[in-house]
Regions:
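Mobile "lid/hinge" segments at catalytic clefts and subdomain interfaces of large enzymes
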Residues: 1-12, 19, 35-37, 57-121, ...
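Short, contiguous, pocket-lining structural segments
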Residues: 121-124, 145
């Protein structure tokens, strides 16, 4: 259960009107979100004049949250638990790619607006996820954030050594938008078959959009039956860079 947030707001030269405008809009956005979500700001820090060679950094507000687990027996994490469980995506996917990791890292596109935030859906989806966790109905949960759906699924597989089989959505969107878009207020949940009906009932009663996107399986990270990787290969790729980085810097 979220209790409060803190922040560190990192910006360039505030003597530049554009930079000061970014800072002011950031504060306004935080204010609106915190008031709606009932998250008090208990502390914070501001850092200006950040840049290199007279070039300002991108506006970088960093938010840290603190929460309370009232019953640790009902807590969960983002590791898949069992082969054959259903995987459900909570929240609507619109395929927003601007300001995404995919656009910046793979396409070198850095402009464009961030994804729209619907505070009503954000609050409702988050509170419903919390309710399902408290009722011990979810095997695992992961928010969809940096990197989009595909990265969150990969993290869950790598952490647990359990694969996935992802099916085609009923309304197939652009594959890059679907898997790499960073639309807000979304969660991946893993559910035992015998708990699915009750989970579905609560989601419908709470007016939460959801779609079944696949199942957990042994060994392979599989998309539509067309693209397939061994989970241990993904693990090796995920850990290899750090070993090579250490070797190069030591």
């Amino acid at each position: 259960k979220p209790l409060a947030i803190t922040n560190c707001l990192n910006f360039g030269n505030p003597e530049n009107e554009e930079i000061m405008g970014e800072f002011a809009e950031t504060i306004q956005g935080m204010k609106e979100a915190c008031e709606y979500l009932d998250f008090p700001v208990v502390s914070g820090n501001v850092s200006f004049y950040n840049g290199t060679n007279k070039k300002n950094i991108f506006p970088t507000p960093v938010i840290g949250g603190i929460g309370l687990i009232e019953n640790v027996k009902c807590s969960t994490n983002n590791n898949f638990k069992k082969i054959g469980n259903r995987i459900i995506l909570i929240g609507k996917t619109f395929g927003h790619l601007y300001q995404s990791a995919f656009f910046s890292e793979c396409c070198e596109i850095y402009d464009g607006p961030p994804p729209e935030v619907n505070l009503k859906n954000e609050k409702n989806n988050g509170e419903t996820i919390l309710k399902l966790i408290e009722k011990d109905l979810l095997s695992s949960v992961h928010d969809v954030s940096s990197g989009g759906l595909i990265m969150s699924l990969a993290e869950m597989s790598i952490n647990s050594s359990i694969g996935v089989h992802i099916i085609k959505p009923k309304k197939l969107k652009n594959i890059f938008e679907y898997f790499f878009g960073e639309d807000q207020g979304r969660y991946i949940v893993e559910i035992d078959d015998d708990k699915f009906d009750l989970v579905e009932k609560i989601l419908k009663e709470s007016n939460v959009f959801y779609e079944i996107i696949g199942k957990t399986q042994k060994d392979f990270f599989e998309i539509y039956g067309e693209t397939k990787f061994k989970v241990n290969e993904l693990y090796n790729i995920n850990t290899k860079w750090y070993k090579e980085y250490n070797a190069a810097t030591n």
